[in-house]
């Protein structure tokens, strides 16, 4: 805790913080490793079964308490112009955060195979970076942006009105009970599924929201071998506390 507090106070050089992060990650991975492959499979099956028994999201209000209900002025100070509250993309020719946000928004559209004229659901829309980008760049698309944060939805609605975007709707909803009207050509969810538990239940519902040729595009953090949830297991669990 002393080391983390010192780092957060800005007293440690970058190389030392990087070394500390690597050390913490190695410790985390050692705690997840299981040398017996059969035991590892049993553990994975038990993990999946536990997720299937619960709700889609355990505490949907918790992220709001942690950071989503922080005033947008804070995020305007630390994020790029688009307020993209998820990872950016840094090709070699990109040197600033605004351009990195644009690069990632464009890549998401390419991989989700967005076409003008589609009806699109942005599930877990954050501060509306992708929804607003779609509404601006694909004027024939009709976009529904969904967040469980009223503050975020109000912000997106105000920005859409300021930009005179008539093809963007915003809805505040709890993912446990959310049921949209109509069908969608694309459902896109960027860095929301990490916070969920019962993926199977939500994906089954999402299947009923798709048009006959519709597709779902998911972008989420994961490890190639280990399954885990975002938990705050202790005072030194930086990722659990802040993500």
Regions found by a protein language model. Name each.
Residues 186-198:
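A short SAM/SAH-binding and catalytic strip from SAM-dependent methyltransferases
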Residues 136-176:
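Class I SAM-dependent methyltransferase SAM/SAH-binding core
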Residues 177-187:
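A short acidic, Gly/Pro-enriched loop at the edge of an enzyme's catalytic core
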Residues 127-139:
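Conserved SAM-binding loop of SAM-dependent methyltransferases across substrates and taxa
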């Amino acid at each position: 805790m002393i080391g983390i507090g010192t780092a957060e106070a800005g007293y440690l050089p970058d190389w030392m913080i990087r070394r500390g992060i690597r050390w913490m990650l190695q410790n985390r991975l050692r705690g997840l490793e299981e040398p017996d492959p059969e035991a590892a499979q049993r553990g994975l099956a038990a993990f999946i079964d536990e997720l299937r028994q619960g709700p889609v999201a355990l505490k949907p209000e918790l992220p709001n308490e942690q950071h989503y209900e922080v005033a947008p002025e804070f995020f305007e100070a630390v994020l790029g112009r688009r307020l993209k509250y998820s990872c950016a993309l840094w090709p070699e020719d990109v040197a600033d955060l605004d351009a990195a946000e644009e690069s990632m928004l464009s890549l998401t559209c390419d991989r989700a195979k967005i076409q003008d004229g589609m009806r699109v659901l942005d599930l877990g829309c954050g501060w509306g970076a992708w929804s607003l980008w779609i509404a601006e760049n694909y004027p024939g698309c009709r976009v529904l942006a969904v967040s469980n944060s009223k503050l975020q939805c109000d912000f997106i609605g105000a920005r859409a009105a300021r930009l005179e975007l008539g093809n963007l709707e915003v809805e505040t909803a709890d993912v446990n009970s959310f049921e949209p009207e109509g069908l969608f050509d694309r459902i896109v969810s960027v860095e929301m599924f990490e916070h969920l538990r019962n993926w199977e239940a939500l994906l089954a519902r999402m299947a009923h929201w798709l048009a006959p040729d519709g597709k779902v595009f998911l972008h989420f953090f994961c490890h190639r071998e280990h399954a885990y949830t975002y938990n705050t297991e202790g005072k030194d669990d930086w990722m659990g506390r802040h993500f």
